[in-house]
From Swiss-Prot:
This is Large ribosomal subunit protein uL13. The keyword Phosphoprotein does not apply. CDD domains: Ribosomal_L13 (cd00392). This protein is one of the early assembly proteins of the 50S ribosomal subunit, although it is not seen to bind rRNA by itself. It is important during the early stages of 50S assembly. It comes from the Bacteria.
Length: 145
């Protein structure tokens, strides 16, 4: 007789959580959000199943970086054409694309593969304090740090 609980799609209850990024450090916020997306904050966590909650991050443009990372940290992408390497520093990313900056940080902390991509789809990042998920009745989540 098996007594260990194994979560599957039929018995998972997902909540919607709102996290305010204002004044938070990028890495600390990203690691906690990645843990929520994986479902590690629940007693029903199962490594091979997607048990995590949906997370809405607001005020992404007010995220903080310590030290001189705002000028030194670089984000790279490539067009797959010769000489197609593009780079931006963290200051440009925070002013122009703060949503991408947070998505890159969080998704880099999720598992690689199909399950990790499925978990990443439950992340919703917004630049300001407004989001369009009021119908899901999200709860405010206070970060531990």
């Amino acid at each position: 007789m098996r007594t260990t609980f194994m979560a599957n799609e039929a018995n998972i209850e997902r909540k919607w959580l709102v996290v305010d990024a204002e004044g938070q450090r990028l890495g600390r916020l990203a690691s906690e959000v990645a843990s929520i997306l994986r479902g590690k904050h629940k007693a029903t966590y199962t490594p091979h199943a997607d048990t995590g909650d949906n997370v809405i991050i607001i005020n992404a443009d007010k995220i903080e970086l310590t030290g001189n990372k705002i000028n030194d940290k670089m984000y790279y992408r490539h067009s797959n054409h010769p000489g197609g390497l593009k780079e931006r520093n963290a200051y440009e990313m925070r002013t122009k694309y703060p949503e991408q900056m947070l998505e890159i940080a969080v998704k880099g902390m999720l598992p690689k593969g199909p399950l990790g991509r499925k978990m990443g789809k439950k992340l919703h990042v917004y630049r300001g304090a407004e989001h369009n998920h009021q119908a899901q009745k999200p709860e405010v989540y206070e970060l531990r740090g």
